[in-house]
Amino acid sequence: MDQQPGSRGEIRDFLASRRARITPAQAGLPTSARRRVAGLRREEVAVLAGVSTEWYTRLEKGHIGGVSEVVLDAVARALRLDDDERTYLFDLARSSRHVGRTPTRRRDVEVPPRVQWLLDSMTTSSAFVRNGRTDIVAGNPLARTLLVPMFDSATVDKHGRPNIARYIFLDPGAHDFFVDWDAAGVATAALLRAEVAREPRDRALRELVGELSTLSPEFRSRWAAHDVLMRHDGVKQLQHPEVGHLELAFQSLNLHLSDRAVHDLIIYTAEPGTASEDRLKLLAIWAATQSRAAQPIRHSPQPGP
């Protein structure tokens, strides 16, 4: 497994994994009983993409820099890439042009007050901002109350900021908190994989992937699958330590805070009339109470004698 974002090994492994999942029958090609490979051969992908076998072989070996968008589109169609995978392939092509550059520590984007005001205005929904590395960089009181196992985890950084990937793969309690832990793990690894193609020189991102690969066999197996997600929506089931089982719909919205760094606004809501809605409302009451208790007391100036 190649950990170098944008490297030839990354491109090779991604294209080979996508080639292996397509059968000749799915591609409309003749099959043979003596066939030794489960997926498509390189020459078959070349035929489907309208390029020579030699050219596609060179592409799959990682020589992707300078390849035209037309050709990349043809390869994406031949491999039946979805929209996220196609974007990922194009990001890999872009990043391969800068593969020799030294990684740098990217300065975090400051969340402006207007975004925090927006978060705080959503009192009955859990809302937080997540960057491409899956750091939670801002949130409303209900998000902190709902995700309390994550905020209280030993995996938070020195500023008390949780990282979703680090919590899921390095905190044993995550298996209890996320009812469908496997789905959460698959999605989180896929989000990180998309980010390494967008930001191949982000040193903190490389360090995170290296840390997870070293310490978590579960992360390694999911990383090796080369699944990609640009954004993640759906339904999540949580086992909260105070209110019990919650089934929540979550929506991910692009939040434009800078021209380069990716930030998503994540909103968790409950279906009206359900037990989960009642439990989320209870958490919202607790969150509001704790938030008021944490606010400093403002003393009005006393009138003079």
Question: Which residue stretches match the model-derived regions?
Answer:
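Amphipathic, well-packed alpha-helical segments that form the structural scaffold of globular domains
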Residues: 16-23, 90, 94, 120, ...
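Short amphipathic recognition helices of helix-turn-helix/homeodomain-type DNA-binding modules
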Residues: 1-18, 67-110
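An N-terminal domain-cap segment
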Residues: 26-39, 99-114, 119-121
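Hydrophobic protein-protein interaction segments
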Residues: 113-133, 137-305
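Short basic helix-loop element that most often maps to the first helix and adjoining turn
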Residues: 4, 9-48
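Recognition helix of helix-turn-helix/homeodomain-like DNA-binding domains
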Residues: 32-36, 42-43, 49-66, 76
